[in-house]
Design a protein with these regions (language model features):
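Short, solvent-exposed positions on alpha-helices
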Residues: 539, 622-626, 648
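Inward-facing hydrophobic residues that define packing positions of alpha-helical scaffold repeats
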Residues: 609, 616, 621, 628-629, ...
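Peripheral terminal and linker regions in Fe-S/redox and tRNA-modifying enzymes
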Residues: 1-613, 618, 722
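Short, hydrophobic/amphipathic alpha-helical patches that form generic packing surfaces
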Residues: 243, 630-641
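Short, charged, amphipathic alpha-helical segments
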Residues: 622-629, 690-694
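Long, charged low-complexity segments
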Residues: 593, 599-606, 610-614, 636-722
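Charged, well-structured alpha/beta interaction segments
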Residues: 620-624, 640-643
């Protein structure tokens, strides 16, 4: 499997260890109070290091990107070791974006953790922050009988293409992309900024593309951008959409609450967005060619059947079935965990092979369980697994001759005790267990539901600790998110209830009311009972809700409303004896203010340099010249902000920079002649464009490196090269 890792190394061409060394230096500067806390926060978010609450000061959540959810068994073993060595929570958490999170990691241990991940080909870069987040893919790709083609290599290549990309690292907010191998759409195209579904037209591979979706506090379903675009142009189409957002989304950049592409599209209209995007694509195709690198990824997938599958001493199924008196076989069939195992078996399109879907409770696995699954994949699967948006794990390529041996491998290690309750069918974010924005503890509610409901009728239940939808409450059959209300002089924890979500058909759940947190499990129980009694045949839950209407469900909520509840339990969350206290923070891990203003200028400068390079290749010299000059002005203005001055004219910006900043030794190079050289290059003929480009690029690079050294007193630490 390491041969695969060598061929699809998403960090190829970059010194990932040098990046980690630089991050370690920044962490050390933070401990020594040589860097501003807000600047440090934006830096650590680039590497997926997130702040937490309810634990020792100095611990963080470390998010680990698993592109497409595709994880090798060796990588699982490494994450098991890291969980054991560094995560005070004691478990690794699978997220709804197919990431893995380690909670309560001491900040001083982060660099060592990242180096050990790098050793097995994993980077955490751009796992958080204003960037293209982990790119997700359908977990059944490669084995689905209905697939058009395997999309996992495209998700991996897309990660490689946009990782460290100037347009990705300079976004005003996060950006999400997904890939599905069929119209069954197990990766939920319509809830993403860009969602792709495999297509073949006239023998050519490509994608049906949706754009402008997203959940969060204001959910929107994506619209169809194109019925088909070929596989190579697809990646340029994404870049074109990003360029359009950067160029025309100034209003969204200035309002963080609306800095997602869905709000930009809503403002300008989808047809205008489509027009701008394809116009940008036409220009981009003149300078870009997606070819050999993509082909290298595609050639690896779909992965072939393992050459060795199953234990050497294992018995094939037909022998077990023909000799039922074998004690071990009888014990297997009588074991109460057999049904759980059997329920998770999924027939592959490859004859003679089966995949196993494992549902860990709330997506959490301890080090021992991770190692068991890694060993299981090596012994019985293909040496890899796929994480799912429902926080599950799929292990494909189990030879049908060794199904019972595979089961026994897990059963004799008591693995099924962790995945046996109804809680395993619930999707939940960690909530206030670790998140600073969360209002409630959804883990506790999920366990409360599991304790009080032996089965959930096959319903998909999604829980979030706040309106931001990390638990994807908008797309569940039943969705709940944390809230609070004032009642009788106290604050009562509640959950807002949504019904009928199904993003695979573009349907967002509808809010029907609130329920006290301690009684949310009662609503689930009575809804499941109603569902089991009243559903028609193969009716889906969203169809059931449409047929019955919301009133029967609102009547259930009314029985538990505050006005009908005088118990002290009203003020308690599930799992807590003490009364609820509102501790959520008003803003999360992406701060506003002066530093954001500076960062916007810097990011726009970087983007201009990147685009100017393409303009030069395309012969658009005037456009390239304008962007290079603008990048110098934006970066200059960024530092002048620190002096409390906001100059507007070209001359004032350059004068203030030269007079106030150039002499401070904040930057590594001498820029005392910046103003004179700027005007000289501005008035130079077009054949001097390369000189202007190189000068502006060097200046912006120096500014970027200096910004990292911003200290708590809002001064820049002197360049270490001086």
């Amino acid at each position: 499997m390491n041969a695969i890792l060598d061929k699809i190394d998403i960090n190829s061409g970059y010194d990932i260890y040098k990046e980690i060394d630089e991050y370690e230096t920044v962490i050390r500067n933070f401990f020594d109070k040589k860097i501003h806390p807000e600047r440090f926060k934006s830096y650590r978010l680039i590497y997926g290091t997130y702040g937490v609450r309810h634990h020792e000061e100095g611990t963080h959540m470390q998010r680990i990107k698993i592109p497409g959810g595709f994880i090798l068994s060796d990588q699982m073993k490494t994450i098991a070791e890291l969980t054991r060595d560094y995560a005070a929570s004691g478990h690794a958490h699978i997220t709804t974006r197919q990431d893995i999170q380690l909670h309560y990691v001491a900040l001083e241990n982060i660099p060592a953790l990242l180096r050990r991940l790098a050793n097995v080909g994993i980077t955490t870069r751009e796992a958080c922050g204003n960037s293209i987040r982990n790119i997700t893919a359908s977990y059944l790709s490669g084995i689905n009988p209905n697939e058009i083609f395997d999309i996992v290599p495209y998700a991996l290549y897309c990660t490689r293409y946009f990782l460290r990309h100037p347009l990705s690292s300079t976004l005003p907010r996060k950006f999400k992309i997904s890939f599905s191998e069929s119209d069954e759409d197990f990766a939920y195209a319509q809830m993403h900024d860009i969602g792709a579904i495999a297509r073949i037209e006239n023998g050519e591979r490509g994608f049906k593309v949706y754009a402008g979706g997203g959940l969060g506090a204001v959910p929107m379903t994506a619209n169809l951008l194109t019925e088909f675009i070929n596989e190579a142009d697809f990646f340029l189409l994404i870049e074109s959409a990003l360029r359009v957002f950067h160029k025309h989304g100034k209003a969204e950049r200035e309002n963080r609450n609306k800095a997602r592409m869905k709000f930009f599209i809503s403002r300008v209209g989808f047809e205008k967005f489509r027009e701008l995007t394809f116009a940008e694509l036409k220009l981009l195709k003149k300078t870009r060619n997606i070819g050999g690198d993509l082909k290298k990824y595609i050639e690896i997938f779909p992965l072939p059947a393992p050459t060795k599958n199953g234990r050497d001493d294992g018995l094939p199924n037909n022998k077990r079935i023909s000799e039922p008196a074998i004690k071990e076989f009888i014990e297997l069939r009588d074991n109460r965990y057999w049904d759980i195992f059997n329920e998770g078996l999924i027939e592959q399109r490859q004859k003679g092979y089966t995949a196993l879907l494992i549902k860990p409770e709330l997506g959490n696995l301890n080090p021992e369980e991770l190692n068991i699954l890694a060993e299981f994949s090596d012994n019985y699967g293909g040496g890899y697994a796929l994480l799912t948006p429902a926080q599950n794990i799929l292990i494909p390529w189990i030879n049908n001759e060794f199904i019972y041996d595979a089961y026994n491998f897990l059963a004799e290690r008591s693995f099924f005790k962790q995945v046996s309750g109804s809680t395993r069918d619930i999707v939940s974010c960690p909530g206030a267990f670790s998140c600073r924005l969360a209002v409630t503890h959804p883990y506790n509610l999920a366990r409360d539901i599991g304790l009080n409901n032996e089965e959930l009728g096959g319903l998909r239940i999604h829980i979030s600790g706040c309106p931001n939808s990390c638990g994807q409450h908008h797309i569940g059959d039943i969705g709940l998110y944390g809230a609070s209300i004032k009642s009788g002089g106290g604050i009562a924890p509640h959950y807002v209830v949504l019904l009928g979500g199904n993003i695979r058909i573009g349907k967002i759940g509808k809010v029907i009311g609130k329920i006290p947190a301690r009684h949310a499990h009662n609503f689930i129980a009575r809804t499941v009972e109603l569902w089991n009694e009243e559903k028609n045949g193969n009716e889906q839950f969203h169809e059931f809700v449409d047929r019955l209407g919301f009133e029967p469900f609102r009547k259930i909520l009314a029985d538990y409303a505050v006005s009908n509840n005088t118990s002290d339990d009203l003020y308690k969350e599930p799992g807590f004896d003490e009364n609820y206290k509102m501790e959520a923070e008003s803003r999360g891990e992406c701060a506003g203010s002066l530093l954001d203003l500076m960062a916007v200028n810097l990011f726009d400068s970087i983007r201009n340099i990147y685009e100017a390079q393409d303009d030069i290749k395309a012969g658009l010299i005037n456009d390239a010249k304008r962007k290079c000059l603008e990048s110098i002005l934006l970066s200059s203005k960024m530092f002048v902000f620190l002096e409390g001055i906001e100059p507007e004219t070209e001359n004032d910006i350059l004068s203030e920079f030269v007079n106030r900043i150039a002499a401070k030794n904040w930057l590594c190079n001498d820029w005392s002649n910046l103003k004179d050289i700027y005007y000289e290059l501005k008035n130079s003929p077009g054949d001097k464009i390369d000189e202007l480009f190189n000068y502006s690029k060097e200046f912006v690079y120096d500014c970027d490196k200096s910004f990292v050294r911003l200290q708590p007193n809002l001064k820049i630490q002197q360049c270490i090269n001086n």
